[in-house]
Amino acid sequence: MKKFLFKQKFCESLPKSFSKTLLALSLGLILLGIFAPFPKVPKQPSVPLMFHFTEHYARFIPTILSVAIPLIQRDAVGLFQVANASIATTLLTHTTKRALNHVTINDQRLGERPYGGNFNMPSGHSSMVGLAVAFLMRRYSFKKYFWLLPLVPLTMLARIYLDMHTIGAVLTGLGVGMLCVSLFTSPKKP
């Protein structure tokens, strides 16, 4: 009986339609991040405390809520949807990191981190925070979780200021997270 219920809830979690607006916005962010020639951000002598706080603490809030809210509301379909979107985001992010590592566009290697290193694009931190916030806003309520929205640019800016990613990489990461939400999440029925 448990297997049938598991399979039934999994099948129910697959969306029957997707958000065309969210899909278009996410694809636009991905293309912008890959093809726009953003300037290299100079190395910062000091990083504002707000970005350290975001990097080490605040960016986890949406991710925790994206799992806690479906559990609290006993929303099995929502739990499957956030799991599906998270797995898809992780796979897409890491596959894209490896695929774009040696690609050069506008005289800039997409995989090169600001001050050395590989696998720059897309930013995994940006993709996961984008996924979590977009999931909560799409599945439950745009208005109810609007307060989480500032954590997205704060996380992106923290990654840039800490010299971990380029501007294009964080935009592409956000697009990847939103893309997976648009494909795997549907609004909760009242």
UniProtKB/Swiss-Prot annotation:
Q: Which SUPFAM superfamilies match?
A: Acid phosphatase/Vanadium-dependent haloperoxidase
> Key word Iron-sulfur present in the record?
no
Task: Name where it's found.
Answer: Cell inner membrane
Q: How does activity depend on pH?
A: Optimum pH is 6.0, activity is seen from pH 5.5 to 8.0.
**InterPro entries the record matches:** P_Acid_Pase_2/haloperoxi_sf (IPR036938), P_Acid_Pase_2/haloperoxidase (IPR000326)
Where it mainly occurs, coarsely classed, is membrane
Pathway involvement?
Bacterial outer membrane biogenesis; LPS lipid A biosynthesis
The record's note on what follows loss of this gene reads: Lipid A retains the 1-phosphate group; none of the lipid A species have the usual phosphoethanolamine residue at the 1-position as the enzyme responsible (EptA) cannot act on a phosphorylated residue. In strain 26695 95% is hexaacylated (16 to 18 carbons in length) with both 1- and 4'-phosphate groups, 5% is tetraacylated with only 1-phosphate. In 4 other strains (Cp20-84, Hp7-91, Hsp110-93 and J99) only the 1-phosphate tetraacylated species is seen.
Cofactor binding mode and count: Does not require divalent cations.
Q: Which family does it belong to?
A: Belongs to the lipid A LpxE 1-phosphatase family.
**The protein's name:** Lipid A 1-phosphatase
